[in-house]
Amino acid sequence: ADLGCDFLASGTHKWLFGPRGTGIVWGRDWEPVAPIVPSFSAAAFNAWQLGGEPTASTADLVTPGGYKAFEHRWAMPQAFAFMMGIGKDRVQQRTQELATRLKAGLAGISHVTLATPQAPELSAGLVCCAITGMQPLQAVERLRAKKVLTSVTPYSHSLLRFGTSIVTTPEQVDLAIKAVEELV
């Protein structure tokens, strides 16, 4: 409610350290929303994404996805309790501190173009950039060899993506900056 949004949908394993593959949906007012049953059929999802009709067999389209992972649901209260025990303000401060450190370090490297805004109020723990003369996937592979884990953004214009969180140390941020400096 503090965000001022009407609905929020989010995965919970990255920011909350909840079970992988679990998410939440929160809504301010559910009355005007028609319930839907999500399909686990790749053909149905792809057809929806492309604005067409699914071509899968009837059996594939009506299978609801199997048995619920109750252990994931049961773990969510503990994940929220863990995060609330640390404190939302402390989590935000630590994540912002590390992301700011990373952005400042990357911005000072001549072959890096920072895509994430440097202003702390305009970003969170994800930091994205481009490396001059290098594809993002190539940078991921070269950084992995230096013990720095990154990923590629899943968009048509992809970027190199770093993530900071409360389990990231300042030393790991500095190692990432040094590894990027050595890429070219």
Model regions and ranges:
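Short beta-strand-to-loop capping motifs
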Residues: G27, C129-G133, T164
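Short amphipathic alpha-helical segments
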Residues: T58-D60, S123-V127, S158-F162
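Glycine- and other small-residue-rich loops at beta-strand/loop junctions that grip anionic moieties
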Residues: K14, G65, S165
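PLP-dependent enzyme catalytic core of the Aspartate aminotransferase-like
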Residues: L137-V184
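Structural motif of enzymes handling amino- and sulfur-group chemistry
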Residues: W48-K103
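Active-site PLP attachment segment
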Residues: L3-L50
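Conserved PLP-binding catalytic core of the aspartate aminotransferase-like
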Residues: K88, Q96-K146
